[in-house]
A protein has these predicted regions:
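Exported/extracytosolic protein signature
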Residues: 1-281
Length: 281
Protein backbone atom coordinates (compact mmCIF):
# COMPACT_ATOMS: atom_id res chain seq x y z
CA UNK A 1 0.00 0.00 0.00
CA UNK A 2 1.34 3.42 -0.95
CA UNK A 3 1.23 6.62 1.07
CA UNK A 4 0.60 9.76 -1.00
CA UNK A 5 2.27 13.06 -0.16
CA UNK A 6 1.98 16.57 -1.62
CA UNK A 7 4.26 19.57 -1.47
CA UNK A 8 4.45 23.15 -2.73
CA UNK A 9 6.74 26.11 -2.09
CA UNK A 10 6.48 29.87 -1.78
CA UNK A 11 8.78 32.57 -3.13
CA UNK A 12 8.97 36.01 -1.55
CA UNK A 13 10.50 39.05 -3.25
CA UNK A 14 10.05 42.82 -2.98
CA UNK A 15 7.13 42.46 -0.64
CA UNK A 16 5.41 39.98 -2.93
CA UNK A 17 4.83 36.23 -2.51
CA UNK A 18 4.11 33.71 -5.20
CA UNK A 19 3.14 30.07 -4.69
CA UNK A 20 4.40 27.24 -6.82
CA UNK A 21 2.36 24.44 -8.27
CA UNK A 22 1.67 21.40 -6.07
CA UNK A 23 3.64 18.25 -6.70
CA UNK A 24 2.38 14.82 -5.67
CA UNK A 25 4.39 11.74 -4.87
CA UNK A 26 3.97 8.46 -3.11
CA UNK A 27 5.92 6.30 -0.74
CA UNK A 28 5.46 2.62 -1.55
CA UNK A 29 5.29 0.43 1.52
CA UNK A 30 7.47 -2.64 1.14
CA UNK A 31 6.33 -4.47 4.28
CA UNK A 32 3.01 -6.33 4.29
CA UNK A 33 1.31 -8.48 6.94
CA UNK A 34 -1.56 -10.93 7.13
CA UNK A 35 -2.91 -12.86 10.09
CA UNK A 36 -4.88 -16.10 9.89
CA UNK A 37 -6.32 -18.49 12.46
CA UNK A 38 -6.03 -22.15 11.50
CA UNK A 39 -9.62 -22.70 12.69
CA UNK A 40 -12.49 -20.23 12.52
CA UNK A 41 -13.93 -21.27 15.89
CA UNK A 42 -12.73 -21.46 19.48
CA UNK A 43 -13.71 -23.23 22.65
CA UNK A 44 -12.55 -21.91 26.04
CA UNK A 45 -9.51 -23.84 27.23
CA UNK A 46 -8.54 -25.16 23.79
CA UNK A 47 -5.58 -23.54 21.94
CA UNK A 48 -6.06 -21.52 18.76
CA UNK A 49 -3.20 -21.51 16.24
CA UNK A 50 -2.38 -18.22 14.53
CA UNK A 51 -0.16 -17.65 11.50
CA UNK A 52 1.29 -14.17 10.91
CA UNK A 53 2.90 -13.78 7.49
CA UNK A 54 5.24 -10.89 6.65
CA UNK A 55 6.15 -10.06 3.06
CA UNK A 56 8.91 -7.82 1.76
CA UNK A 57 8.36 -6.42 -1.74
CA UNK A 58 11.57 -4.39 -1.58
CA UNK A 59 15.10 -5.15 -2.70
CA UNK A 60 16.62 -4.81 0.77
CA UNK A 61 16.31 -7.14 3.74
CA UNK A 62 14.12 -5.85 6.58
CA UNK A 63 15.49 -6.62 10.02
CA UNK A 64 15.00 -5.84 13.71
CA UNK A 65 11.21 -5.91 13.30
CA UNK A 66 8.87 -6.24 16.27
CA UNK A 67 5.52 -8.06 16.32
CA UNK A 68 2.92 -7.00 18.89
CA UNK A 69 -0.34 -8.94 19.31
CA UNK A 70 -3.00 -7.52 21.64
CA UNK A 71 -4.46 -11.02 22.13
CA UNK A 72 -7.99 -9.76 21.63
CA UNK A 73 -7.93 -7.09 24.36
CA UNK A 74 -11.28 -5.34 24.90
CA UNK A 75 -12.77 -2.89 27.37
CA UNK A 76 -15.35 -4.03 29.93
CA UNK A 77 -16.69 -1.64 32.57
CA UNK A 78 -13.63 0.56 32.16
CA UNK A 79 -11.17 -2.32 32.49
CA UNK A 80 -9.06 -3.85 29.75
CA UNK A 81 -9.55 -7.61 29.54
CA UNK A 82 -7.40 -9.99 27.50
CA UNK A 83 -9.32 -13.11 26.40
CA UNK A 84 -6.34 -15.04 25.02
CA UNK A 85 -3.34 -16.39 26.91
CA UNK A 86 -0.18 -16.93 24.88
CA UNK A 87 1.01 -20.54 25.13
CA UNK A 88 4.59 -20.45 26.32
CA UNK A 89 7.27 -21.70 23.89
CA UNK A 90 4.72 -22.22 21.12
CA UNK A 91 6.38 -19.84 18.60
CA UNK A 92 7.63 -21.33 15.34
CA UNK A 93 9.60 -19.10 12.94
CA UNK A 94 9.91 -19.67 9.19
CA UNK A 95 11.93 -17.64 6.68
CA UNK A 96 11.06 -18.35 3.05
CA UNK A 97 9.45 -21.57 4.24
CA UNK A 98 12.44 -22.84 6.23
CA UNK A 99 12.11 -23.40 9.98
CA UNK A 100 14.75 -21.40 11.86
CA UNK A 101 15.54 -20.71 15.50
CA UNK A 102 12.65 -19.11 17.38
CA UNK A 103 12.85 -15.35 17.91
CA UNK A 104 12.76 -13.62 21.29
CA UNK A 105 9.43 -13.37 23.09
CA UNK A 106 9.91 -10.12 24.99
CA UNK A 107 6.43 -10.01 26.55
CA UNK A 108 3.30 -12.12 26.76
CA UNK A 109 0.49 -9.59 27.34
CA UNK A 110 0.51 -8.07 24.84
CA UNK A 111 2.50 -10.72 23.04
CA UNK A 112 5.72 -9.07 21.86
CA UNK A 113 8.19 -10.83 19.57
CA UNK A 114 11.39 -9.02 18.62
CA UNK A 115 14.28 -9.45 16.21
CA UNK A 116 12.27 -10.52 13.17
CA UNK A 117 13.78 -10.48 9.69
CA UNK A 118 12.17 -10.58 6.25
CA UNK A 119 14.51 -11.19 3.29
CA UNK A 120 14.35 -9.02 0.19
CA UNK A 121 11.51 -10.18 -2.03
CA UNK A 122 10.74 -12.89 0.49
CA UNK A 123 8.49 -13.77 3.38
CA UNK A 124 8.56 -14.71 7.01
CA UNK A 125 5.90 -16.64 8.94
CA UNK A 126 5.44 -16.60 12.70
CA UNK A 127 3.21 -19.36 14.06
CA UNK A 128 2.03 -19.53 17.67
CA UNK A 129 -0.89 -20.65 19.79
CA UNK A 130 -3.00 -18.81 22.33
CA UNK A 131 -5.71 -20.29 24.55
CA UNK A 132 -9.09 -18.66 25.26
CA UNK A 133 -9.30 -17.98 29.00
CA UNK A 134 -11.96 -16.88 31.53
CA UNK A 135 -12.35 -13.54 29.72
CA UNK A 136 -13.23 -15.15 26.38
CA UNK A 137 -16.97 -14.90 25.57
CA UNK A 138 -18.35 -18.47 25.75
CA UNK A 139 -21.98 -17.92 24.70
CA UNK A 140 -23.40 -18.34 21.21
CA UNK A 141 -22.21 -15.74 18.70
CA UNK A 142 -19.24 -14.77 20.89
CA UNK A 143 -16.12 -13.57 19.07
CA UNK A 144 -12.48 -12.72 19.71
CA UNK A 145 -10.85 -10.18 17.40
CA UNK A 146 -7.16 -9.61 17.87
CA UNK A 147 -4.80 -7.27 16.10
CA UNK A 148 -1.16 -7.75 15.27
CA UNK A 149 1.14 -4.79 14.56
CA UNK A 150 4.56 -4.92 12.92
CA UNK A 151 6.98 -2.08 13.58
CA UNK A 152 10.52 -1.30 12.49
CA UNK A 153 12.86 1.66 12.16
CA UNK A 154 12.18 3.68 9.03
CA UNK A 155 9.08 1.68 8.14
CA UNK A 156 5.39 2.48 8.23
CA UNK A 157 3.68 0.40 10.92
CA UNK A 158 1.41 -2.28 9.42
CA UNK A 159 -1.44 -4.13 11.11
CA UNK A 160 -3.69 -7.13 10.51
CA UNK A 161 -6.67 -8.51 12.40
CA UNK A 162 -8.30 -11.91 12.70
CA UNK A 163 -11.63 -12.88 14.24
CA UNK A 164 -12.62 -16.28 15.58
CA UNK A 165 -16.10 -17.18 16.81
CA UNK A 166 -17.32 -19.50 19.53
CA UNK A 167 -17.88 -23.11 18.61
CA UNK A 168 -21.64 -23.38 19.03
CA UNK A 169 -22.10 -26.95 20.20
CA UNK A 170 -23.07 -28.98 23.27
CA UNK A 171 -20.36 -30.35 25.56
CA UNK A 172 -21.73 -33.20 27.67
CA UNK A 173 -20.38 -34.90 30.76
CA UNK A 174 -22.04 -37.73 32.67
CA UNK A 175 -21.76 -39.06 36.20
CA UNK A 176 -23.37 -42.21 37.60
CA UNK A 177 -24.45 -42.88 41.15
CA UNK A 178 -25.64 -46.02 42.94
CA UNK A 179 -27.90 -46.18 45.99
CA UNK A 180 -27.57 -48.10 48.17
CA UNK A 181 -24.07 -49.36 47.55
CA UNK A 182 -24.73 -52.46 49.64
CA UNK A 183 -27.96 -54.40 49.06
CA UNK A 184 -29.36 -57.82 49.95
CA UNK A 185 -30.34 -60.41 47.38
CA UNK A 186 -33.64 -59.55 45.68
CA UNK A 187 -33.23 -56.03 46.99
CA UNK A 188 -33.86 -52.82 45.07
CA UNK A 189 -31.17 -50.49 43.79
CA UNK A 190 -31.28 -47.11 42.11
CA UNK A 191 -28.93 -45.82 39.43
CA UNK A 192 -28.81 -42.05 39.00
CA UNK A 193 -27.32 -40.55 35.85
CA UNK A 194 -26.59 -36.82 35.88
CA UNK A 195 -25.89 -35.44 32.42
CA UNK A 196 -24.42 -31.93 32.32
CA UNK A 197 -23.98 -29.67 29.31
CA UNK A 198 -21.12 -27.16 29.50
CA UNK A 199 -21.64 -26.12 25.88
CA UNK A 200 -23.53 -23.10 24.60
CA UNK A 201 -26.06 -25.15 22.61
CA UNK A 202 -28.70 -27.57 23.86
CA UNK A 203 -28.14 -31.30 23.25
CA UNK A 204 -31.18 -32.89 21.63
CA UNK A 205 -29.89 -36.23 20.36
CA UNK A 206 -28.25 -37.83 23.41
CA UNK A 207 -28.70 -41.60 23.81
CA UNK A 208 -27.77 -43.29 27.09
CA UNK A 209 -26.78 -46.94 27.01
CA UNK A 210 -25.94 -49.09 30.02
CA UNK A 211 -25.65 -52.83 30.55
CA UNK A 212 -26.71 -53.44 34.13
CA UNK A 213 -24.70 -56.11 35.92
CA UNK A 214 -26.26 -57.74 37.82
CA UNK A 215 -29.32 -57.57 35.59
CA UNK A 216 -32.34 -55.72 36.94
CA UNK A 217 -35.97 -56.74 36.94
CA UNK A 218 -39.13 -54.68 37.30
CA UNK A 219 -37.33 -51.51 36.33
CA UNK A 220 -38.79 -48.04 36.61
CA UNK A 221 -37.18 -45.09 34.84
CA UNK A 222 -37.73 -41.36 35.29
CA UNK A 223 -36.29 -38.35 33.49
CA UNK A 224 -36.17 -35.16 35.54
CA UNK A 225 -38.84 -36.70 37.78
CA UNK A 226 -41.20 -37.68 34.94
CA UNK A 227 -41.91 -41.38 34.41
CA UNK A 228 -40.64 -42.93 31.17
CA UNK A 229 -42.53 -45.55 29.19
CA UNK A 230 -40.85 -48.79 28.13
CA UNK A 231 -40.78 -49.19 24.36
CA UNK A 232 -41.63 -45.55 23.75
CA UNK A 233 -38.95 -43.77 25.76
CA UNK A 234 -36.46 -46.58 26.33
CA UNK A 235 -35.78 -50.24 25.64
CA UNK A 236 -34.61 -52.84 28.12
CA UNK A 237 -33.47 -56.40 27.51
CA UNK A 238 -33.97 -58.28 30.76
CA UNK A 239 -31.90 -61.20 29.44
CA UNK A 240 -28.76 -59.13 28.90
CA UNK A 241 -29.36 -56.14 31.16
CA UNK A 242 -29.01 -53.72 28.21
CA UNK A 243 -30.84 -50.42 28.80
CA UNK A 244 -31.03 -47.82 26.02
CA UNK A 245 -32.96 -44.57 25.80
CA UNK A 246 -34.73 -43.72 22.57
CA UNK A 247 -32.94 -41.16 20.43
CA UNK A 248 -34.23 -37.66 21.10
CA UNK A 249 -35.80 -38.49 24.46
CA UNK A 250 -32.93 -37.08 26.48
CA UNK A 251 -32.36 -33.37 25.96
CA UNK A 252 -29.90 -31.30 27.96
CA UNK A 253 -30.22 -27.50 27.99
CA UNK A 254 -27.30 -25.25 27.15
CA UNK A 255 -25.11 -23.85 29.90
CA UNK A 256 -25.65 -20.33 31.15
CA UNK A 257 -22.79 -17.85 31.46
CA UNK A 258 -22.34 -14.84 33.71
CA UNK A 259 -19.63 -12.19 33.40
CA UNK A 260 -18.51 -10.81 36.76
CA UNK A 261 -19.11 -7.06 36.82
CA UNK A 262 -15.88 -6.46 38.77
CA UNK A 263 -13.35 -8.92 37.38
CA UNK A 264 -14.87 -9.49 33.95
CA UNK A 265 -14.35 -13.26 34.25
CA UNK A 266 -17.06 -15.58 32.97
CA UNK A 267 -18.51 -18.34 35.13
CA UNK A 268 -20.38 -21.33 33.74
CA UNK A 269 -23.45 -23.05 35.14
CA UNK A 270 -24.02 -26.22 33.12
CA UNK A 271 -27.43 -27.28 31.90
CA UNK A 272 -28.47 -30.52 33.59
CA UNK A 273 -30.75 -33.52 33.07
CA UNK A 274 -31.21 -36.39 35.54
CA UNK A 275 -32.18 -39.95 34.63
CA UNK A 276 -33.03 -42.42 37.42
CA UNK A 277 -33.44 -46.17 36.87
CA UNK A 278 -34.69 -48.36 39.72
CA UNK A 279 -34.95 -52.14 39.72
CA UNK A 280 -34.57 -55.34 41.70
CA UNK A 281 -31.50 -57.56 41.54
Amino acid sequence: MATTFTNRSSLSYGGNTVISNTVTGEIAEVLGVTKTAVTDEYRPGEPVTYIVTLTNSGSTELSALTLTDNLGAYTFNGTTLVPLTYDESSVKYFINGDLVAAPTVAGTSPLTITGLTVPAGGNTAIVYTATPNDFAPPAEDGTITNTVEITGTGLTDVTATETVATEDAPELRISKGLCPTSVTENGTIEYTFIIENFGNTAATDAVLTDTFNPRLTNIVATLNGTALTAGTDYTYDAATGLFTTVAGKITVPAATYTQNATTGAYTTVPGSTTLVVTGAI
